[in-house]
Swiss-Prot record:
EC number: 2.7.2.11
Family listed: Belongs to the glutamate 5-kinase family.
Cross-referenced HAMAP family: ProB
GO biological-process terms attached to the record: L-proline biosynthetic process
UniProt lineage: Bacteria, Bacillati, Bacillota, Bacilli, Bacillales
Organism: Listeria innocua serovar 6a (strain ATCC BAA-680 / CLIP 11262)
Gene, per the UniProt record: proB
Protein name: Glutamate 5-kinase
UniProt keyword NAD, yes or no: no
GO molecular function, one term: glutamate 5-kinase activity
Pathway annotation: Amino-acid biosynthesis; L-proline biosynthesis; L-glutamate 5-semialdehyde from L-glutamate: step 1/2
InterPro entries on file: AceGlu_kinase-like_sf, Asp/Glu/Uridylate_kinase, G5K_ProB, Glu/AcGlu_kinase, Glu_5kinase, Glu_5kinase/COase_Synthase, Glutamate_5-kinase_CS
Main location: cytoplasm
Length: 276
Protein backbone atom coordinates (compact mmCIF):
# COMPACT_ATOMS: atom_id res chain seq x y z
CA UNK A 1 0.00 0.00 0.00
CA UNK A 2 2.80 2.45 0.89
CA UNK A 3 4.58 1.75 -2.40
CA UNK A 4 1.49 2.89 -4.30
CA UNK A 5 1.82 6.36 -2.74
CA UNK A 6 4.79 7.00 -5.05
CA UNK A 7 2.34 7.19 -7.94
CA UNK A 8 0.17 9.87 -6.29
CA UNK A 9 -0.12 12.80 -8.69
CA UNK A 10 -2.67 15.05 -7.02
CA UNK A 11 -2.01 15.89 -3.36
CA UNK A 12 -3.84 17.86 -0.69
CA UNK A 13 -1.62 19.00 2.19
CA UNK A 14 -3.29 20.24 5.37
CA UNK A 15 -1.30 22.30 7.86
CA UNK A 16 -2.61 23.40 11.25
CA UNK A 17 -2.02 26.46 13.39
CA UNK A 18 0.21 24.48 15.78
CA UNK A 19 2.61 23.81 12.89
CA UNK A 20 2.59 27.42 11.64
CA UNK A 21 2.94 29.11 15.03
CA UNK A 22 5.27 28.77 17.99
CA UNK A 23 3.72 28.16 21.40
CA UNK A 24 4.47 31.78 22.32
CA UNK A 25 2.16 33.07 19.57
CA UNK A 26 4.87 34.05 17.09
CA UNK A 27 4.96 32.83 13.48
CA UNK A 28 7.20 29.84 12.71
CA UNK A 29 8.84 31.26 9.58
CA UNK A 30 11.34 28.39 9.33
CA UNK A 31 8.59 25.78 9.02
CA UNK A 32 6.56 27.88 6.57
CA UNK A 33 9.60 28.41 4.35
CA UNK A 34 10.39 24.67 4.38
CA UNK A 35 6.77 23.91 3.52
CA UNK A 36 6.92 26.34 0.58
CA UNK A 37 10.14 24.72 -0.66
CA UNK A 38 8.76 21.17 -0.40
CA UNK A 39 5.46 21.95 -2.15
CA UNK A 40 7.21 23.99 -4.86
CA UNK A 41 9.59 21.09 -5.48
CA UNK A 42 6.67 18.67 -5.74
CA UNK A 43 5.21 21.01 -8.37
CA UNK A 44 8.55 21.00 -10.22
CA UNK A 45 8.41 17.21 -10.15
CA UNK A 46 5.04 17.31 -11.91
CA UNK A 47 2.73 16.79 -8.94
CA UNK A 48 -0.44 18.83 -8.46
CA UNK A 49 -0.62 20.34 -4.98
CA UNK A 50 -3.36 22.01 -2.94
CA UNK A 51 -2.55 23.48 0.48
CA UNK A 52 -5.29 23.71 3.12
CA UNK A 53 -3.97 26.11 5.75
CA UNK A 54 -5.30 27.18 9.12
CA UNK A 55 -3.80 30.09 11.01
CA UNK A 56 -5.84 33.19 10.12
CA UNK A 57 -6.85 33.97 13.70
CA UNK A 58 -3.46 32.97 15.14
CA UNK A 59 -1.54 35.14 12.67
CA UNK A 60 -4.07 37.94 13.18
CA UNK A 61 -3.49 37.89 16.94
CA UNK A 62 0.25 38.12 16.28
CA UNK A 63 -0.16 40.98 13.80
CA UNK A 64 -2.39 42.95 16.16
CA UNK A 65 -0.22 42.07 19.16
CA UNK A 66 -3.12 40.57 21.08
CA UNK A 67 -2.01 38.62 24.17
CA UNK A 68 -4.98 36.25 24.00
CA UNK A 69 -7.39 35.07 21.33
CA UNK A 70 -10.61 37.14 21.41
CA UNK A 71 -13.74 35.35 22.61
CA UNK A 72 -16.56 37.19 20.82
CA UNK A 73 -17.48 36.14 17.27
CA UNK A 74 -17.23 39.68 15.75
CA UNK A 75 -13.77 40.17 17.29
CA UNK A 76 -12.58 36.74 16.14
CA UNK A 77 -13.81 37.44 12.62
CA UNK A 78 -12.15 40.86 12.54
CA UNK A 79 -8.87 39.32 13.69
CA UNK A 80 -9.26 36.56 11.05
CA UNK A 81 -9.68 39.25 8.38
CA UNK A 82 -6.32 40.79 9.29
CA UNK A 83 -4.67 37.41 9.81
CA UNK A 84 -5.79 35.88 6.51
CA UNK A 85 -4.31 38.69 4.42
CA UNK A 86 -1.08 38.56 6.45
CA UNK A 87 -0.94 34.76 6.10
CA UNK A 88 -1.32 34.99 2.32
CA UNK A 89 1.36 37.70 2.21
CA UNK A 90 3.78 35.35 4.01
CA UNK A 91 2.89 32.39 1.76
CA UNK A 92 3.14 34.48 -1.40
CA UNK A 93 6.57 35.74 -0.34
CA UNK A 94 8.02 32.31 0.46
CA UNK A 95 6.47 30.48 -2.50
CA UNK A 96 7.59 33.35 -4.74
CA UNK A 97 11.19 32.75 -3.67
CA UNK A 98 10.87 29.29 -5.24
CA UNK A 99 9.23 30.63 -8.40
CA UNK A 100 5.79 29.34 -7.45
CA UNK A 101 2.50 31.23 -7.82
CA UNK A 102 -0.26 30.70 -5.24
CA UNK A 103 -3.97 31.53 -5.28
CA UNK A 104 -6.29 32.09 -2.32
CA UNK A 105 -9.53 30.09 -2.05
CA UNK A 106 -11.79 30.86 0.94
CA UNK A 107 -14.71 28.50 1.50
CA UNK A 108 -17.74 28.13 3.76
CA UNK A 109 -19.85 25.04 4.34
CA UNK A 110 -22.88 26.35 2.45
CA UNK A 111 -20.72 26.83 -0.67
CA UNK A 112 -19.50 23.22 -0.79
CA UNK A 113 -22.88 21.78 0.30
CA UNK A 114 -24.85 23.51 -2.50
CA UNK A 115 -24.44 21.66 -5.85
CA UNK A 116 -24.07 24.70 -8.16
CA UNK A 117 -21.56 26.56 -6.00
CA UNK A 118 -19.76 23.28 -5.23
CA UNK A 119 -19.25 22.65 -8.94
CA UNK A 120 -18.00 26.20 -9.32
CA UNK A 121 -15.40 25.59 -6.59
CA UNK A 122 -14.33 22.37 -8.33
CA UNK A 123 -13.92 24.21 -11.64
CA UNK A 124 -11.93 27.00 -9.98
CA UNK A 125 -9.55 24.54 -8.30
CA UNK A 126 -9.12 22.60 -11.56
CA UNK A 127 -8.37 25.82 -13.44
CA UNK A 128 -5.73 26.83 -10.87
CA UNK A 129 -4.09 23.39 -11.02
CA UNK A 130 -4.09 23.41 -14.84
CA UNK A 131 -2.15 26.69 -14.73
CA UNK A 132 0.42 25.26 -12.34
CA UNK A 133 -0.82 27.42 -9.46
CA UNK A 134 -0.93 26.10 -5.88
CA UNK A 135 -4.37 26.87 -4.38
CA UNK A 136 -4.19 27.83 -0.70
CA UNK A 137 -7.55 26.98 0.87
CA UNK A 138 -8.92 28.11 4.21
CA UNK A 139 -12.32 28.45 5.78
CA UNK A 140 -13.62 31.99 5.35
CA UNK A 141 -13.43 32.73 9.08
CA UNK A 142 -14.49 36.35 8.56
CA UNK A 143 -18.03 35.40 7.50
CA UNK A 144 -18.55 31.77 8.58
CA UNK A 145 -21.11 31.27 11.34
CA UNK A 146 -22.48 28.30 13.20
CA UNK A 147 -26.10 28.73 14.14
CA UNK A 148 -28.98 26.28 14.30
CA UNK A 149 -30.74 27.83 11.32
CA UNK A 150 -27.73 28.67 9.20
CA UNK A 151 -24.58 26.58 9.53
CA UNK A 152 -21.78 27.78 7.28
CA UNK A 153 -18.81 26.60 9.37
CA UNK A 154 -16.94 23.34 8.75
CA UNK A 155 -15.99 23.22 12.41
CA UNK A 156 -12.32 22.67 11.63
CA UNK A 157 -9.92 22.54 8.72
CA UNK A 158 -9.40 18.80 9.18
CA UNK A 159 -12.84 18.17 7.71
CA UNK A 160 -12.38 20.96 5.16
CA UNK A 161 -9.20 19.30 3.87
CA UNK A 162 -11.04 15.98 3.45
CA UNK A 163 -13.88 17.73 1.59
CA UNK A 164 -11.37 19.47 -0.70
CA UNK A 165 -9.59 16.14 -1.32
CA UNK A 166 -12.90 14.62 -2.43
CA UNK A 167 -13.85 17.65 -4.56
CA UNK A 168 -10.62 17.43 -6.58
CA UNK A 169 -10.43 13.60 -6.42
CA UNK A 170 -6.98 13.80 -4.83
CA UNK A 171 -4.80 10.70 -4.72
CA UNK A 172 -3.66 11.47 -1.18
CA UNK A 173 -4.41 13.81 1.72
CA UNK A 174 -1.41 14.49 3.97
CA UNK A 175 -2.42 15.97 7.31
CA UNK A 176 0.48 17.70 9.05
CA UNK A 177 -0.14 17.85 12.78
CA UNK A 178 1.78 18.22 16.04
CA UNK A 179 1.82 14.45 16.60
CA UNK A 180 3.72 11.73 14.69
CA UNK A 181 0.62 9.67 13.90
CA UNK A 182 -2.31 7.88 15.54
CA UNK A 183 -1.39 6.20 18.82
CA UNK A 184 -3.04 3.55 20.96
CA UNK A 185 -2.41 5.73 24.02
CA UNK A 186 -1.16 9.24 24.76
CA UNK A 187 2.54 9.35 23.77
CA UNK A 188 3.17 12.42 25.93
CA UNK A 189 2.29 10.48 29.10
CA UNK A 190 2.91 6.87 28.03
CA UNK A 191 6.51 6.11 26.95
CA UNK A 192 5.34 2.72 25.64
CA UNK A 193 2.64 4.21 23.40
CA UNK A 194 2.48 2.39 20.06
CA UNK A 195 1.72 4.21 16.82
CA UNK A 196 -0.53 2.59 14.22
CA UNK A 197 1.21 2.30 10.85
CA UNK A 198 -2.05 1.69 9.00
CA UNK A 199 -5.76 1.82 9.83
CA UNK A 200 -8.25 0.26 7.41
CA UNK A 201 -11.46 0.88 9.32
CA UNK A 202 -12.59 3.47 11.88
CA UNK A 203 -14.11 1.24 14.56
CA UNK A 204 -15.71 2.35 17.86
CA UNK A 205 -12.55 1.04 19.55
CA UNK A 206 -10.37 3.33 17.40
CA UNK A 207 -12.68 6.27 18.14
CA UNK A 208 -12.41 5.56 21.88
CA UNK A 209 -8.61 5.73 21.63
CA UNK A 210 -8.92 9.15 20.02
CA UNK A 211 -10.53 10.74 23.03
CA UNK A 212 -13.92 9.12 23.22
CA UNK A 213 -15.64 8.37 26.51
CA UNK A 214 -13.31 7.37 29.30
CA UNK A 215 -10.13 8.27 27.43
CA UNK A 216 -7.53 10.73 28.68
CA UNK A 217 -6.15 11.20 25.17
CA UNK A 218 -6.57 14.64 23.65
CA UNK A 219 -9.36 17.16 23.91
CA UNK A 220 -11.08 16.18 20.67
CA UNK A 221 -8.34 17.28 18.31
CA UNK A 222 -7.68 13.69 17.32
CA UNK A 223 -11.39 12.99 16.94
CA UNK A 224 -11.67 15.63 14.21
CA UNK A 225 -8.75 14.00 12.41
CA UNK A 226 -10.51 10.62 12.62
CA UNK A 227 -13.67 12.21 11.19
CA UNK A 228 -11.62 13.54 8.29
CA UNK A 229 -10.00 10.12 7.81
CA UNK A 230 -13.42 8.45 7.83
CA UNK A 231 -14.67 10.96 5.23
CA UNK A 232 -11.68 10.13 3.01
CA UNK A 233 -12.05 6.38 3.39
CA UNK A 234 -15.77 6.54 2.57
CA UNK A 235 -14.78 8.36 -0.63
CA UNK A 236 -12.20 5.62 -1.42
CA UNK A 237 -9.34 8.00 -0.74
CA UNK A 238 -6.16 7.74 1.31
CA UNK A 239 -5.01 9.98 4.15
CA UNK A 240 -1.77 10.13 6.12
CA UNK A 241 -1.53 11.74 9.54
CA UNK A 242 2.01 12.77 10.47
CA UNK A 243 4.09 15.40 12.25
CA UNK A 244 4.53 18.71 10.42
CA UNK A 245 7.42 20.14 12.41
CA UNK A 246 9.73 19.27 9.51
CA UNK A 247 7.75 19.47 6.23
CA UNK A 248 10.47 17.54 4.33
CA UNK A 249 8.75 14.48 5.80
CA UNK A 250 6.40 14.82 2.80
CA UNK A 251 9.29 13.67 0.57
CA UNK A 252 9.63 10.52 2.72
CA UNK A 253 5.90 9.83 2.35
CA UNK A 254 6.14 10.20 -1.42
CA UNK A 255 8.99 7.65 -1.43
CA UNK A 256 6.69 5.09 0.20
CA UNK A 257 8.48 5.16 3.56
CA UNK A 258 6.70 4.10 6.75
CA UNK A 259 5.91 7.58 8.03
CA UNK A 260 2.90 8.52 10.15
CA UNK A 261 -0.39 6.62 10.09
CA UNK A 262 -1.97 5.69 6.75
CA UNK A 263 -5.77 5.60 6.68
CA UNK A 264 -7.01 3.57 3.71
CA UNK A 265 -9.92 1.18 3.36
CA UNK A 266 -9.13 -2.26 1.95
CA UNK A 267 -11.81 -1.80 -0.73
CA UNK A 268 -9.70 1.09 -2.05
CA UNK A 269 -7.04 -1.40 -3.16
CA UNK A 270 -9.55 -3.38 -5.20
CA UNK A 271 -11.17 -0.33 -6.77
CA UNK A 272 -7.89 1.10 -8.05
CA UNK A 273 -5.71 -1.91 -8.77
CA UNK A 274 -8.19 -4.68 -9.38
CA UNK A 275 -6.03 -6.86 -7.15
CA UNK A 276 -5.47 -7.15 -3.44
Amino acid sequence: MRESLKNSKRLVIKVGTSTLMYGNGHINLRTIEKLAMVLSDLRNEGKEVILVSSGAIGVGCHKLQLPVRPTSIPEQQAVASVGQSELMHIYSKFFGEYGQVVGQVLLTRDVTDFPISRENVMNTLESLLERGIIPIVNENDTVAVEELEHVTKYGDNDLLSAIVAKLVQADLLIMLSDIDGFYGSNPSTDPDAVMFSEINQITPEIEALAGGKGSKFGTGGMLTKLSAASYCMNANQKMILTNGKNPTIIFDIMQGEQVGTLFASKKEEFSHDGTH
